[in-house]
Amino acid sequence: MNIKKLVRKDIRELIPYQSARKIGGKGDIWLNANEFPEFNNIKLNNIILNRYPECQPEQLTSCYSSYIGINKSNILITRGIDEAIELLIKTFCNPQNEKIIFCPPTYDMYNISAKIIGIKSYEVPLLNFSWQLDINNIAKYISDAKLIYICNPNNPTGNLINYQDIITLLNITLGKTLVIVDEAYIEFSPIHSLTNLIDTYPNLVILRTLSKAFALAGLRCGFILTNVNIVKFLLKVINPYPIPIPTTSIAVQFLSKNNINEMRNRIFDLTLNRFWLVNKLKSMNNCVEHVFNSFANYILVRFYNSRKVFDILSKKGIIVRDQSNKLHLSRCLRISIGTSKECLEVVRVIQKINSLCVY
């Protein structure tokens, strides 16, 4: 039996998302998935697993509402941001004639999720090197696009999207298109969050996660923050039991006041590591062409020979993410910010490459 003949043509041709775990590699220093470099101590006591969980656990919704400062009715819990991306497309896009807009170089799952569901995409690249929205070009495609995905801070470039451009986009799409702002990394630059605009713009949807700053990537817990009417429709489409009971228990622990303070302290330390790493790399002119400014827990670096740098780092057990195949990112590697010790080892290896001109 030829199973391939039964598979949708577009799925047969689909190039799937290459997660850090799929790509793999052998090493001791993992700086390729923007995970927090150190793990948390987690307690699981008296967990009852013979009953199905609530669709939207009340305790977790309340805790996140207190943390984020918005009403509980504006929150939908999902299994990470990836489920949220897909859920919005399923709910709002008609495969026959509606599309999404995404702005590369950015997170690949916006486009891949649309393809899997059978929705076409408009690709409107960010302006080269500034990595800002091309508002004039986006405006040309709004009429038959239901969703626009924006990552802020943007992954993999690390920059913030201009606030006024987002406001302009919200205004020109009002009543026509939802503007979805992925704030997966916003805890590393919290004053730039758009949560205060949810009541002002009914077409604004914000995506959040516990994977990055909260160091809970393995938990798969995300949030959609938006107006009440959008939440009501999403609840029609989301799976009946999306949030496992252990996920709720752990997430609630880490949304306590003490753990939130600890998270902010960790971000402070990691930000110091980022500044230090950026300054060191900028001094290595023989092999480093450019270090892009970052407001997240990773940096994007353009090397004169990124393949050689990538291979040498890998041989030394340091796993980073090659971005050279992305639009406008030739010779670029993305390096997640690790511990002080890990950053020191990255610098040691690249300094050797720089001094010997081995690239």
From Swiss-Prot:
Pathway participation: Amino-acid biosynthesis; L-histidine biosynthesis; L-histidine from 5-phospho-alpha-D-ribose 1-diphosphate: step 7/9
SUPFAM superfamilies referenced in this protein's UniProt entry, alphabetically: PLP-dependent transferases
A matching Pfam family: Aminotran_1_2
Cysteines joined through disulfide linkages: none
GO molecular function: histidinol-phosphate transaminase activity; pyridoxal phosphate binding
Cofactor: pyridoxal 5'-phosphate
CDD domains: AAT_like
The family this protein is said to belong to: Belongs to the class-II pyridoxal-phosphate-dependent aminotransferase family. Histidinol-phosphate aminotransferase subfamily.
The protein's name in its UniProt record: Histidinol-phosphate aminotransferase
Gene: hisC
